[in-house]
Regions:
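Hydrophobic membrane-spanning alpha-helices of multi-pass integral membrane proteins
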Residues: 253-261, 316-317
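Extended hydrophobic-aromatic, low-complexity segments
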Residues: 216-220, 233-235, 244-245, 264-270, ...
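Conserved phosphate/anionic-ligand binding catalytic regions in large, soluble enzymes, centered on
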Residues: 53-58, 218-227, 317-322
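Peripheral docking tails and interdomain loops at the edges
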Residues: 306-348
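Active-site phosphate/pyrophosphate-binding segments
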Residues: 2-44, 135-254, 264, 331-348
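Short, local alpha-helical segments
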Residues: 253, 300-310
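Glycine-rich phosphate-binding loops that contact phosphosugars or nucleotide phosphates
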Residues: 29, 36-182, 211, 258-304, ...
Length: 348
């Protein structure tokens, strides 16, 4: 098997998550004490690329566990249209692997000037973002050399759990401490996933579906297929997919689905039933206890750990990351250096 940097960094995730949890739990506790005196009525998240997918997860997690409304910022409203958004009383959270995203940092700077409480989530402690934000949570992933972000994405997700905890959300730190071991279990599926990827060597298009807390993973998996494998990959909520896009599906059309246990299963299962009737080729990522999936999916990637739905997003993205890395190798592509891409992208 070709050993890309991307695959190396995927394998580093359990230790990176353990470092992040051990170090940033203290910062989260400190922020928890601070925010008790200044509880925000609104949270605004700003990010680009993979970090934007992490922010989408943050929106679901924060609203579900804290009840505080969350908005995803559209940077062009300020950077291009020059609107002066009133951030007074809000918590504005900027998410950036490098901490050097121009538009993300500009929004954070404006927000702080206009009365917002600001927090940065980044992998770089010496970055512009870390200097601009009043409070910082650091991804302790170490240097990420592959252009395709993997270990920093899961680190960002973990920090959103810590942020939810700090804001009084229904999050138990003891539960979070189980996530790295669940990721180790997912990594043990590498040979199985490498063999599976061979079947899709000539895949040119695909759809990825998820819902709820794993909806962001559908975006992230699709992004990895696009940037490392050059597959045209669309991503949808399992509910939204039925409102038009399902017309794309014909026999053998490839669909990848995140199918965790919990409140989203009925919706996802219903969508898979419909896809099965259309003879789609369905690959589902699910848990070891879901026996209903066998009748719905063409192939199933089963994680080794049975987790509550709220804890599934980090371990569930790992098989998808490995699949993209393995498929890129099967296609003769270098996932570490996708054409026309750089590690840090500057936009306004």
């Amino acid at each position: 098997m070709f050993m890309s940097r991307m695959l190396e960094e995927i394998r580093q995730q359990p230790e990176a998550l353990e470092r992040t949890f051990a170090s940033e739990m203290r910062r989260a506790e400190k922020f928890k004490r601070f925010v008790e005196k200044r509880r925000p009525k609104l949270i605004v998240l700003v990010a680009r690329g993979t970090s934007d997918n992490a922010a989408l997860f943050g929106r679901y997690l924060l609203e579900i566990t804290t009840g505080i409304p969350v908005s995803l910022a559209a940077p062009s409203i300020e950077t291009l249209y020059k609107a002066r958004v009133n951030y007074s009383g809000a918590l504005v959270v900027a998410v950036s692997q490098s901490g050097e995203s121009t538009d993300t940092n500009l929004i954070l700077e404006h927000a702080r000037e206009r009365g917002a409480l600001t927090l940065g989530i980044t992998n770089e402690s010496g970055s512009s973002l870390a200097r601009l934000a009043e409070h910082v949570l650091l991804v302790r992933a170490g240097k990420e050399r592959s252009v395709a972000a993997t270990k920093t994405y899961t680190g960002q997700l973990l920090l959103f759990y810590l942020l939810a905890y700090a804001l009084g959300g229904r999050i138990r730190p003891d539960d979070l401490a189980r996530i790295p071991e669940a990721v180790r279990g997912a990594l043990a599926l590498e040979d199985e996933i490498d063999a599976l990827s061979e079947r899709y060597r000539f895949m040119r298009y695909a759809v990825v579906v998820g819902r709820g807390l794993n909806y962001s993973n559908a975006f992230e998996f699709a992004l990895k297929l696009m940037e490392t494998c050059y597959v045209v990959a669309e991503r949808f909520s399992s509910a939204d997919f039925l409102h038009g896009p399902i017309a794309l599906v014909e026999p053998s059309f490839p669909v990848f689905a995140f199918a965790p246990p919990g409140v989203t299963w009925e919706s996802i299962g219903g969508t898979l039933d419909k896809l099965r009737s259309l003879k789609a080729e369905i690959v589902a990522i699910s848990d070891p206890g879901n026996r209903e999936i066998e009748a719905r999916a063409t192939r199933t990637i089963r994680l080794k750990s049975k987790l509550k739905e709220v804890l599934t997003p980090i371990p569930y993205i790992v098989p998808a990351q490995m699949f993209a890395a393995c498929l890129a190798a099967k296609k003769g592509l270098d996932p570490d250096q996708p054409r026309t891409l750089k590690k840090v992208t500057l936009t306004l």
